[in-house]
Amino acid sequence: MANHKSAEKRARQTIKKTERNRFYRTRLKNITKAVREAAANGDKNAANEALKVANKSIHAMVSRGFIKKQTASRRVSRLALLVNKIA
């Protein structure tokens, strides 16, 4: 347990930050999984729709500071390659 007022504040901030990061990390995994599943099923329309949602969500995470810009671009690029491979 924290003994100083500033340490108590840091503990509160850490809890909030951890919850926020857990939310974004879970969301990132789920939207990525949705695109990959649609691509694996060969459903081009569903994969394109999932890719649009993923692109928007991933770049929103950049603006919130959860992931870096280059990381987001790499993830979206790899998902787009996967979707474009569907015959």
From Swiss-Prot:
Name by which UniProt lists this protein: Small ribosomal subunit protein bS20
Matches recorded under Pfam families: Ribosomal_S20p (PF01649)
Family recorded in the similarity comment: Belongs to the bacterial ribosomal protein bS20 family.
Cysteine disulfide partners in this protein: none
GO biological process: translation
GO terms assigned for molecular function: small ribosomal subunit rRNA binding; structural constituent of ribosome
Function: Binds directly to 16S ribosomal RNA.
Keywords tagged on the record: Ribonucleoprotein, Ribosomal protein, RNA-binding, rRNA-binding
HAMAP family assigned: Ribosomal_bS20 (MF_00500)
Stretches assigned to coiled coil: none
The encoding gene: rpsT
Lineage of origin: Bacteria, Pseudomonadati, Campylobacterota, Epsilonproteobacteria, Campylobacterales
Region spans: Disordered: 1-21
Species this chain originates from: Campylobacter jejuni subsp. jejuni serotype O:23/36 (strain 81-176)
Gene3D superfamilies: Ribosomal protein S20
Domain of life: Bacteria
GO cellular-component term (any): cytosol
